[in-house]
Each structure stands twice: as structure tokens, then as C-alpha cells.
Amino acid sequence: MLFHRILPQYKTAISTYLTPTHCRLYIANLVTSRRMTNIEAAKKLAAYRAVDENLPPHAKVIGIGSGSTVVYVAERIGQLPNKDDFVCISTGFQSKQLIIDNGLKLGQIEQHPSIDIAFDGADEVDPQLNLIKGGGACLFQEKLVASASDKLIIVADFRKQSKHLGQNWRQGVPIEVVPIAFTKLINDLKRLGAKSVDLRQGGKAKAGPVITDNNNFILDADFGIIEDPKSLHLQLKQLVGVVDTGLFTGITEKVYFGEESGEVTTWDGVVTGSTTEEVIAESK
């Protein structure tokens, strides 16, 4: 029934060459494709709104993070008529390329330690605007830029929303570590309650572990549901060999989500105890 409704003009031709199983697979792929198109459109809208509503008119230094939604942030900033009036600070290789590709001026944080505003993505966000970041192995530079910024704005899609950190993001908390300390740190993290700790590997693109832009390793530590992200971050930072963690707490001002429906949801911090559903309802 769905097949005949969606593709009436192709019904005879496709039915001639495809079995019922192939038809169902074709329709499933078509629906998935349309869903992803809606998500991408919403991500773009969220990014554009984030820039339009938050970028100071006389900003001189802007931080640009990484992630699939931040691509649209850089695109929007690159459309500004005054883009020659400011410099952009990257958080890693990907964001550096985004800055260059969109005709923006690239600056260095060593020369511009005070940043007017930063835009970045996230792997998971809870209603208190705590974040898990570091899926792209840029967490230290992302946190450095965020901490130097007067305002941090996060853009992401709805799949990054979560009632608690660790609920939807199952890969663990990314932790950047000094290479010589990684073996000891695996044991230390397990003693702190990590269910598992993995040294992140380069996969097909690289034999061996991922090397960050700072020549460090990434450990992914699964602590399950994280009830107190700030406390966990502070405990992890006390371990010798830890450079920084992917837990970002008390630093985000607002989050823009592209929804599956094509709409944009914004979170700007709520009273502790509110549920994700309540936050979404309040923000629409």
C-alpha cells in the first residue's frame, strides 16, 4: 500500500523488475533518505538561527568548533558582509578547514586569547546543558576555546538530547591522556567506576591508536549514566596523565537542536530535575 502511494508513477515499471522484497527495501531506503534530508535541513536551520541570534554585531574574535552541524555555522558566518572584520579560532583540523573553505580569516588562540563567542557541536546534551564532547578527538582544544569565550553556543541535532549524560552516548567519556600514562590510567579509571576503558583506535584509516592534534591518546571510559558530571570531571582531572575530559559543565549558554520534524528547539538551562520532555515542551 505504501509502495503504491509513494511512487504511483513508477508502479508498473518498478513492479516489473523488482520482487516484493526489493520493493519494500526500496521504500524503506526512500523513507530513510527523506528523514535524513529533513534532519539535515533542520541542522542547517538551527545553525543559521544560532549565528543570527547570538553573534555580536561587532565581534572581533569568533571560535569555530567541529561537528556536522557546525559545518552550517561556518557557512552562515562566511556569508556575512563584514567577515573581514573578525578572525576565527579553530578547535582542530576540521574546523580550521571549515574556516578556510568559507573564506574566513584564521587566527591563533595564542594571539587572540579572549574570544567574543564560540560555536561548537556536542555528542550529548542534558537539560542542565552539561555536554559530552570529544567524539572527534578534539576535546582539549574545544575546551580551551570554550573557556576563553564570553559565550558558548552549541548546535546539534535532536539525537544528541538526553535526560542524563551517558544515556544515549554509549561510547564512553572521551579523555585525552599523555601517551606514556595510558596503561596506568586504564586501571585508575576502572577503580573510579568505569565499566570499560578503551584506547581509541584509528580504524581503517590508521593502524594503531588515534593521535590528537596535541600528540596525545584518547581513552573512552564508560561510566554508564552520569548523575553528577561536574564531580566526575573533577575526579578525572586529578589523575596524573589526564590532559582533559570530554565533560563540559557550567560553560554552555544555549543549545540549538535541529528536530526530525524540521523545526528548531532551543535549550537555555532549566531547574535541576526537569525532564528532557519538559525542556522540549517549554522551548517550543
UniProtKB/Swiss-Prot annotation:
Does the entry feature the keyword Zinc, yes or no? no
Question: Which Gene3D superfamilies does this chain map to?
Answer: 3.30.70.260, 3.40.50.1360
Q: What is this protein called?
A: Ribose-5-phosphate isomerase
GO MF, one example: ribose-5-phosphate isomerase activity
GO biological process terms, semicolon-separated: D-ribose metabolic process; pentose-phosphate shunt, non-oxidative branch; pyridoxine biosynthetic process
**Gene encoding it?**
RKI1
The protein's superkingdom reads Eukaryota
UniProt key word Isomerase: yes
Q: Which UniProt keywords apply?
A: Cytoplasm, Isomerase
What EC number(s) would the UniProt record show? 5.3.1.6
Q: Which PANTHER family match?
A: RIBOSE-5-PHOSPHATE ISOMERASE
Protein's cellular compartments: Cytoplasm
Matching Pfam families:
Rib_5-P_isom_A
User: Which principal EC class is assigned to this enzyme?
Assistant: isomerase
